[in-house]
Amino acid sequence: MAGGVTGGAAGAWSDRFEQGLHPFVEAFNASIGFDLTLLQEDLDGSIAHARMLASCGVIAEEEAVQLVDGLELIRTEAADGRFNPGLEDEDVHFAVERRLIALVGSVGKKLHTGRSRNDQVGTDLRLWLRRRLDEIDGDLQRLQRALLDQADRHQSTMIPGYTHLQRAQPLCLAHHLLAYIEMLQRDRQRLGDVRGRVNICPLGAAALAGTPVPIDRRRTAEDLGFTAIYANSLDAVSDRDFCVEFSAAASLVMAHLSRLAEEVIAWASEEFGFVRLSDRCATGSSLMPQKKNPDVPELVRGKCGRVFGHLQGLLTMIKGLPLAYNKDFQEDKEALFDAYRTTRDCVEAMAILFEEGLEFRIDRLNQAVESDFSNATDVADYLVARGVPFREAYQLVGAVVRRCLEQDCLLRELSLEQWKEIHPAFEADLHEALAPRAVVSARRSEGGTGFDRVHEQVMLWQERLKESAVG
């Protein structure tokens, strides 16, 4: 068409449009500023597509070789910093196509045969996320190992256990740390589930309805390492469930990290004093010279909002979209990329913190477990073991605690005579049973905080994580 638009991304539809884009609209419409993140995946997908076209007789073998060589040259240029797309390219797909045509000539125009940017970007995103999921899994394993190393060192260390942030019962410190290892394992399992649904190939669905070109979708999917192809072309190009699923799984990772971070922040305070932060993982105040601030866990706690926000943004983006592809989908990438980066950074930060950034203060922990009423439940258990109904024992011990508070003393400071005045079932072995270490040891039920049970779990997790490393 005379006077048509030429050059850049607009060249792909130049015969339809007579005027160029308004400069602001061109910038507003472009995604090249962030979707260049998908360059390696775009090249991988295009190479597999070119080879498939040749295997199906759509293009000649020598043309496929030219295309693949050109795409690999673009990869080299990118690594050397010589591939520099501009705003006129609009997105990574047009940037690659433009450069490919410049390198190999008109044969480069055949690469897009049998596909659309709609199925192309869906493929790129899935390839990208599949790799990132594997990386995050490795990071989570690292954090698990850091926690496990601390747990191994503190199998005989005790810490107050809390409910409602009130001291409840003494625990083995290793047991407390193992709880977070369990949470992180569920996170790994969830991310693994996401990976299974990410690993389905949309390439070949074209714009929305498939293509009359005789392609082999399964060949391309296999070459790219996908386990299956989408059965419905409309679903293939419009599905962003996997972005939401990843953001949801990442949000749970962040929630768990935030819980751990909050405990470290509290433990590092003078009010608790359970941990001492390393200079390598803390900062000072610009005004108060005595301060050592827990910036790492505070930032982790704060960054939760970013990942949670991306989940809400993605859900809101897709909720009203008709089939099939809509430009709204351009908004999935920055949310997905940032959710990944933020989550991975926070996992690494917490791993470093537990590897070399904090030290548990055993003296303060011992002082804490020996200076409260967290052994009150064990007094009730003592009576129950001697035939007293639990509810009666519970009420008796509650009255004893009140009496101790009035007299400003602890349970273990009451004499045997005072205990016998409360109930004749109390004997001389009571004081031994109320010692914090005895209280912890008594929790022998499976999954409990008893030292022997905790040792079993430490050994089990050492074996599990060793197998994960090998796998």
Swiss-Prot record:
Signal peptide: none annotated. Its EC number is 4.3.2.1. It catalyses: 2-(N(omega)-L-arginino)succinate = fumarate + L-arginine. Pathway: Amino-acid biosynthesis; L-arginine biosynthesis; L-arginine from L-ornithine and carbamoyl phosphate: step 3/3. It is found in: Cytoplasm. GO terms for cellular component: cytosol. This is Argininosuccinate lyase. It comes from Parasynechococcus marenigrum (strain WH8102).
